[in-house]
Amino acid sequence: MPDRDRLQMARDAYGAYVSGDRRVIEELLSDDFTFYSPADVGIDRDRYFERCWPNAELIEDTEFVRLVQDGDEVVVTYESTKTDGHRFRNTEVLTFDGEKICKTEVYFGWNLE
């Protein structure tokens, strides 16, 4: 059993986007991290930081709707508010290898406002 709570690690990962603290997310992702979404299928860690991390500047707040752990996976549904006031909802599946997130699958498309 990992020493760290995976649900808290998931919260910390999304919190990094709100705070803009890249160091936090860098520590949580494995070296062989892979990211999947309809827009980016199977990109590596470096490409993830190029494509996804800049969005941290646009995120003002994130509220969790669902956080469920099942074995090595944590399912997260969240609603985020952007700096322009628009809100959106995503669901993501985070896969862990020990105490690192090794894969993220993103399902998106819900604009709330």
Identify the residue ranges that each predicted region occupies.
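A beta-strand edge to alpha-helix "cap/lid" segment located at domain peripheries
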Residues: 2-5, 12, 18, 34-38, ...
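Short helix-adjacent coil turns
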Residues: 20-24
